[in-house]
């Protein structure tokens, strides 16, 4: 989250007249992330203060956004702890602010666990599987907009910034994934609405009696219909690694995948293509971070991520042995 579009106290106070949320007490920009303008919003009504998150969307359109917002509402009504969009007085959950789409959602309690252990990873795996099952009957359809077609489209824009070894790696991996995505095995993989960006900083934990309890997932604005195995691979590639090397931490990876498998059993075909999906997850974020790093947009508090992190992860996944990639331990 970042701030590309600034909003004054008077502007948000006027905008909130269309909501039944009381008076603005504080609006504070959120520095993390790089896609949208995000703010913590505090209001007061009848002597009680409440916390929300205001998001102004910088790339997504009014036509695209209902998929994400209604997915969050759908999951919230099915017991998955996610931010719930707040409707305005007219019932709409998406409105224009400073000429751009904007929404208000509930603020989840807790803090991100940036140094997760196996127990944290197991909780995330369990909720991710429950989220996938809860989304099965979500009626809206939208593909993951940062999948293979986007990687192929973006390749030409980022190749000039790469050295020869990086260009070869990028081109070969996109070709591998294109072949995989076109296979009968890929077509047979189960899927549905996916988060597609479930990193450590997109989940919150509450401390309860000395135990960190998962409080929920947020930032669904990269969500889309995709293969569930891809969503799990993206999550493992962030939560279950040594950050310095990109190497998988087996204890955390096993905990997350086994907890997921206990709720939604993985098929033999999914197990056979685990490494392909770990590679796909690494490629997706290597491409997007190269794009954000070398072709940045101006923003207050913008903090682009280092693209070499996911290059290392991709190289590590390519070097996995067949035994390590087979999920034989689930």
From Swiss-Prot:
Pathway: Amino-acid biosynthesis; L-threonine biosynthesis; L-threonine from L-aspartate: step 4/5. Its EC number is 2.7.1.39. Signal peptide: none annotated. It catalyses: L-homoserine + ATP = O-phospho-L-homoserine + ADP + H(+). The keyword Chaperone does not apply. Gene3D superfamilies: 3.90.1200.10, Phosphorylase Kinase, domain 1. It holds the Pfam family APH. The keyword Disulfide bond does not apply. It comes from the Bacteria. Keywords: Amino-acid biosynthesis, ATP-binding, Kinase, Nucleotide-binding, Threonine biosynthesis, Transferase. GO terms for biological process: threonine biosynthetic process. Belongs to the pseudomonas-type ThrB family. This is Homoserine kinase. It comes from Cupriavidus pinatubonensis (strain JMP 134 / LMG 1197) (Cupriavidus necator (strain JMP 134)).
């Amino acid at each position: 989250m970042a701030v590309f579009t600034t909003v004054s106290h008077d502007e948000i106070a006027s905008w909130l007249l269309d909501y039944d949320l009381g008076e603005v007490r504080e609006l504070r920009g959120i520095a993390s992330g790089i896609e949208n303008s995000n703010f913590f919003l505090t209001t007061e009504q009848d002597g009680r203060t409440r916390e929300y998150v205001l998001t102004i969307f910088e790339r997504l359109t009014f036509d695209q956004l209902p998929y994400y917002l209604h997915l969050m509402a759908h999951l919230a009504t099915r017991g998955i702890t996610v931010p719930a969009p707040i409707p305005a007085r007219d019932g709409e959950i998406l409105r224009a602010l400073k000429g751009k789409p904007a929404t208000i959602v509930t603020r989840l309690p807790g803090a991100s666990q940036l140094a997760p252990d196996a127990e944290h990873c197991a909780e995330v795996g369990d909720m991710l599987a429950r989220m996938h099952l809860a989304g099965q009957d979500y009626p809206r359809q939208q593909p993951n907009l940062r999948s293979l077609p986007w990687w192929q489209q973006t390749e030409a824009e980022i190749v000039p910034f790469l050295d020869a070894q990086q260009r070869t790696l990028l081109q070969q991996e996109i070709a591998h994934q294109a072949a995989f995505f076109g296979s009968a095995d890929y077509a047979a993989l189960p899927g549905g609405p996916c988060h597609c960006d479930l990193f450590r900083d997109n989940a919150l934990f509450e401390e309860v009696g000395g135990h960190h309890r998962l409080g929920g997932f947020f930032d669904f604005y990269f969500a889309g219909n995709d293969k569930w195995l891809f969503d799990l691979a993206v999550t493992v590639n962030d939560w279950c690694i040594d950050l310095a090397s990109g190497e998988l931490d087996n204890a955390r990876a096993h905990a997350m995948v086994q907890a997921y498998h206990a709720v939604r059993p993985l098929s033999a075909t999914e197990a056979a293509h685990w490494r392909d999906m770990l590679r796909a997850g690494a490629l997706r974020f290597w491409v997007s971070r190269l794009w954000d790093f070398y072709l940045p947009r101006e923003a207050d508090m913008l903090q682009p991520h280092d693209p070499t992190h996911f290059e290392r992860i991709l190289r590590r996944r390519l070097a996995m042995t067949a035994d390590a990639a087979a999920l034989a331990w689930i």
